[in-house]
């Protein structure tokens, strides 16, 4: 992987420090050009220098919609910048959909395996929809539920038998 520039946006000081440590120890190709603990700190950083990657916490300032809006605006103004969401939002799947629709290149949950060089490399190489194990498990679980529901619906339709009344009614409609 070639060298790239990153801005880390994280509102919890301890998590910011840990994320910076992951980048410095595990992803030496990353040059950290700035960190922000809020949306207000992020935009001036971006004006100084546009990074190749923004690692963005979804729940800035306790509001989950701020991360989505930051992503949407960033991708609107700088579509070439990769955005990797690094979040603790485990249960709010709608947020995952919202941020992907806003242009995020991937989502890594802070639970489970942390940020890895493989994930970052995939995003930097242009791969979309980069997820770690907890997200993939949730996606597969939801997909399985949807398939089972759809199969039950189809089976219900197939098992329906027409009786004499249904036939007469359909003939009447056809006339």
What do these predicted ranges mean?
Residues 150-175:
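Helix-turn-helix DNA-binding segment
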Residues 54-74:
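Conserved phosphotransfer microenvironments
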Residues 47-49, 73-81, 102:
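Conserved phosphotransfer cores of two-component systems
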Residues 100, 106, 111-157:
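Short, flexible helix-to-coil linker/hinge segments that flank and couple to helix-turn-helix
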């Amino acid at each position: 992987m070639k060298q790239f520039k990153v801005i880390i946006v994280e509102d919890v000081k301890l998590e910011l420090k840990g994320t910076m440590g992951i980048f410095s120890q595990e992803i030496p190709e990353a040059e950290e050009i700035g960190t922000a603990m809020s949306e207000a700190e992020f935009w001036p950083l971006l004006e100084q220098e546009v990074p190749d990657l923004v690692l963005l916490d979804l729940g800035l300032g306790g509001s989950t919609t701020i991360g989505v809006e930051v992503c949407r605006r960033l991708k609107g103004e700088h579509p070439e910048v990769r955005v990797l969401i690094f979040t603790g939002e485990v249960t709010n799947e709608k947020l995952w959909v919202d941020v992907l629709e806003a242009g995020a290149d991937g989502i890594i949950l802070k639970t489970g395996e942390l940020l890895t060089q493989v994930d970052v490399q995939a995003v930097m190489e242009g791969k979309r929809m980069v997820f770690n194990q907890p997200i993939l498990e949730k996606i597969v679980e939801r997909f399985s539920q949807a398939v089972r529901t759809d199969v039950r619906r189809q089976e219900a339709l197939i098992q329906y038998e027409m009786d004499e009344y249904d036939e007469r009614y359909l003939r009447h409609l056809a006339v």
